[in-house]
Curated annotation (Swiss-Prot):
Belongs to the GatC family. InterPro entries: Asp/Glu-ADT_sf_sub_c, GatC. The gene is gatC2. Allows the formation of correctly charged Asn-tRNA(Asn) or Gln-tRNA(Gln) through the transamidation of misacylated Asp-tRNA(Asn) or Glu-tRNA(Gln) in organisms which lack either or both of asparaginyl-tRNA or glutaminyl-tRNA synthetases. The reaction takes place in the presence of glutamine and ATP through an activated phospho-Asp-tRNA(Asn) or phospho-Glu-tRNA(Gln). It comes from Clostridium acetobutylicum (strain ATCC 824 / DSM 792 / JCM 1419 / IAM 19013 / LMG 5710 / NBRC 13948 / NRRL B-527 / VKM B-1787 / 2291 / W). PANTHER family: GLUTAMYL-TRNA(GLN) AMIDOTRANSFERASE SUBUNIT C, MITOCHONDRIAL. SUPFAM superfamilies: Glu-tRNAGln amidotransferase C subunit. This is Glutamyl-tRNA(Gln) amidotransferase subunit C 2. Pfam families: GatC.
Length: 97
């Protein structure tokens, strides 16, 4: 790969958004791992698929389970590990700036 896509500052920025903390060494290691992953995508992107019929596998039959809602009776048990409640709802920290 000629250009770096992920540097230490990018890792630190993403970790801040996701509320994770990494040392400089960890951030450097992660930047290298992300670069390797993106390198694999670049390799895959170079594969010639012009002779492949992309619609060949459209008839996959996936059976889904029924999505049946159930009432959860034990609200106290459900809320026992919640850090913060507001008006009976779970309050979570803002993550989008």
């Amino acid at each position: 790969m000629s250009d770096k896509h992920v540097d230490i500052d990018t890792v630190k920025y993403i970790s801040k958004l996701s509320k994770l903390k990494f040392t400089d060494n960890e951030a450097k290691k992660l930047a290298g791992e992300f670069e390797a992953i993106l390198g694999h995508f670049e390799t895959i992107d170079k594969v010639d698929l012009s002779d492949i019929n992309v619609n060949e596998f459209d008839e996959v039959n996936t059976e889904f389970r029924k999505d049946v809602p159930k009432v959860f009776e034990d609200k106290k048990k459900l809320m026992q590990n919640v850090k913060s409640l507001r008006d009976g709802a779970i309050e979570v920290p803002k993550i989008i700036e």
